[in-house]
UniProtKB/Swiss-Prot annotation:
It is a peripheral membrane protein. Its EC number is 3.6.5.n1. CDD domains: EF4_II, EF4_III, LepA, lepA_C. The keyword Transport does not apply. This is Elongation factor 4 1. Its main location: membrane. GO terms for cellular component: plasma membrane. It comes from Lactiplantibacillus plantarum (strain ATCC BAA-793 / NCIMB 8826 / WCFS1) (Lactobacillus plantarum). Keywords: Cell membrane, GTP-binding, Hydrolase, Membrane, Nucleotide-binding, Protein biosynthesis. InterPro entries: EF-4, EFG_III/V, EFG_V-like, EFTu-like_2, G_TR_CS, LepA_C_sf, LepA_CTD, LepA_IV. Transmembrane segments: none annotated. Disulfide bonds: none annotated. Residues 11-193 form the tr-type G domain. GO terms for molecular function: GTP binding; GTPase activity; ribosome binding; translation elongation factor activity.
Length: 611
């Protein structure tokens, strides 16, 4: 293909993402676009086509970004090449959204005609505005009885500050307004820039491991051209490879002769070493390299840490390999090896939030056939020691002795909660119960309020989101950012079973709530841990002080069942023998701890009261 044809092709490319709050209809809209552009036949059509993981379909959420090439015959008679990148909407996966947007020139903003602008809508659209993307607003679900498109149009203009006069009125489910949207994409979103003659510069925005092809890199070509047979260099690691295949997803992989500036596609180069590739890296030509790499992505720091252990210690290496492969496909995941007296060898993993942790655990179990135990998630604490040194503690079991600690600082978040007027009281009560400090309250219109609180991250990570939804009948929406560290009066609570400390059950709590939490957890463990043949004392301690104790009663086998009549000394002898046996068992007995016990540490009775 000559240069003029390539330049003409570049002018017909449109790269865009779809961004929205959870459940506003992104994936359904993507389905309709694929259908209308004949990218996928009616026979192959299924709901959430771009959500390729079973897990995404089951939960009805998008977890991974997904890029696909479509061809659209516009009303001006020209054929345009669309690269559509579907993105997640949940706060835990904001990182996936920011990576998708870096590969685009425009963003389609989907807002539910009944729900209006919500917290994640704002968070995601601001990411797009920061990247200078052209925004095409779509008001979706206009066929719902509760739809108020004009009110939502005004919200988009007032809350986000973008012109919504031409906003597309659509119903992705019914297929209304999809053609208008495609025409707006053609006319509003600019074609990509990029010099075809310059040295190759391609940004890696995702990668996945394929057993046959090695690492498959998802790239946005910013400058130059790449073809099979080219020698490429990954600028971050300096490793060089020969390209075996380039292509696009449509939505299945289609090999191409080349990828050029403006294209979004994939490159394979028989990369077997997972450590060589990193999301945010720049791919260039080894013989004619670019001088400077592209600006990558800011590294995401994990918010939540938890231990993941194989139930069978022999599977430790399998777990390491599985985590390495997942890290390719999920750049925000962090892990390092650790050991626990109770659970053996495993990994301390860092996640962006609880949903992220849940998804990783489920993917490890499904995709790699592993049986795992996950400990209760915790956050990173900054501990200042009496000798002046600082220590970061990600695992409560590693918290130093209280006598050696000067102060403990915990991470706080700035939580923005958008809520209807009627539920402001319920939200404020919940935030205060979670040790939140009130910051500001802003009335967005006559019915909606944006409440801002500073809340310890440890109080948010477990069930704050669920509580918020149930206390406001699902109307409130939440977005939060890390807001530095603050000193708090915190203590470590250890759990002892049968006199032995179970390091994986240790947790950190505020001193004021520690005795109550200790009692609740001891009582909870009593119901969760199965009864044994001997009595098990369950104790919660702070240092050497026991703050709660309960006993798990033993099973009792009737050893005298076969006796009838006769001398009672025979009966007493058998009962004494049983007692001695139980005593011996108690001395050497190991207590089996089920998975629910680790999560019980986080749930408190106060949380479980019906709202």
């Amino acid at each position: 293909m000559d240069k003029a044809t390539m330049q003409d092709r570049q002018q017909h490319i449109r790269n865009f993402s779809i961004v929205a709050h959870i459940d506003h209809g992104k994936s359904t809209l993507a389905d309709r676009i694929l259908e209308l552009t004949d990218t996928i036949s009616k026979r192959e059509m299924q709901d959430q086509v771009l959500d390729s993981m079973d897990l995404e379909r089951e939960r009805g959420i998008t977890i991974k970004l997904n890029a696909v090439e479509l061809h659209y015959q516009a009303k001006d008679g020209e054929t345009y090449i669309f690269h559509l990148i579907d993105t997640p909407g949940h706060v835990d996966f904001t990182y996936e959204v920011s990576r998708s947007l870096a590969a685009c020139e425009g963003a389609v903003l989907v807002v539910d005609a009944a729900q209006g602008v919500e917290a994640q809508t704002l968070a995601n659209v601001y990411l797009a505005i920061d990247d200078d993307l052209e925004i095409v607003p779509v008001i979706n679900k206009i066929d719902l009885p509760s739809a108020e498109p004009e009110k939502v149009r005004k919200e988009i203009e007032d809350d986000i500050g973008i012109d919504a006069e031409d906003a597309v009125l659509a119903s992705a489910k019914a297929g209304i307004g999809i053609e208008d949207l495609l025409e707006q994409i053609v006319h509003k979103i600019p074609a990509p820039q990029g010099d075809l003659d310059a040295p190759l510069k391609a940004l890696v925005f995702d990668s996945v491991y394929d057993d046959y092809r090695g690492v498959v890199l998802s790239v946005r070509i910013h400058e130059g051209i790449v073809r099979p047979g080219d020698r490429i260099r990954l600028m971050n690691s300096g490793s060089e490879y020969e390209v075996t295949e380039v292509g696009v997803n449509s939505p299945k992989p289609l090999a191409r002769d080349y990828l050029m500036a403006g294209d979004v596609g994939y490159i394979t180069a028989s990369i077997k070493d997972i450590q060589d590739t990193r999301v945010g890296d720049t791919v260039t030509n080894a013989k004619n390299p670019a001088e400077k790499p592209l600006a990558g992505y800011r590294e995401m720091n994990p918010m939540v840490y938890a231990g993941i252990y194989p139930t069978d210690n022999a599977k430790f290496t399998d777990l390491r390999e599985a985590l390495e492969k997942l890290k390719l496909n999920d750049a925000a995941l962090e892990f390092e090896a650790e050991s626990s007296q109770a659970l053996g060898f495993g990994f301390r993993c860092g996640f962006l939030g609880l949903l992220h942790m849940d998804v990783i655990q489920e993917r490890l179990e499904r995709e790699f056939n592993l049986e795992l135990i996950t400990t209760a998630p915790s956050v990173t604490y900054h501990v200042r020691m009496t000798d002046g040194t600082e220590k970061k503690v990600e695992n409560p079991a590693e918290m130093p002795e209280a006598s050696a600690i000067k102060e403990i600082r915990e991470p706080y978040v700035k939580a923005q909660i958008m809520v209807p007027n009627d539920y402001v009281g319920a939200v404020m009560e919940l935030a205060q119960r979670k040790r939140g400090e009130f910051d500001t309250m802003e009335y967005l219109d006559s019915n909606r309020v944006n409440v801002v609180y500073h809340i310890p991250l440890s109080e948010i990570i477990f069930d704050f989101f669920d509580k918020l939804k149930s206390n406001t009948r699902g109307y409130a929406s939440l977005d939060y950012d890390l807001d530095g560290y603050r000193a708090s009066d915190l203590v470590k609570i250890d759990i002892l079973l049968n006199g032995d400390q179970v390091d994986a059950l240790s947790f950190i709590a505020h001193r004021d709530f520690a005795p109550a939490r200790g009692r609740e957890i001891a009582a909870k463990l009593k119901t969760i841990i199965p009864r044994q043949n001997f009595e098990i004392p369950v104790q919660a301690t702070i240092g050497s002080k026991v703050i709660a104790r309960t006993n798990i009663k033993a099973y009792r086998k009737d050893v005298t069942a076969h006796l009838y009549g006769g001398d009672r000394t025979r009966r007493m002898k058998l009962l004494e023998k049983q007692k001695a046996g139980k005593k011996r068992m108690k001395a050497v007995g190991k207590v089996e701890i089920p998975q629910e016990a680790f999560m019980a540490v986080l749930k408190t009775d106060e949380d479980e009261k019906p709202n």
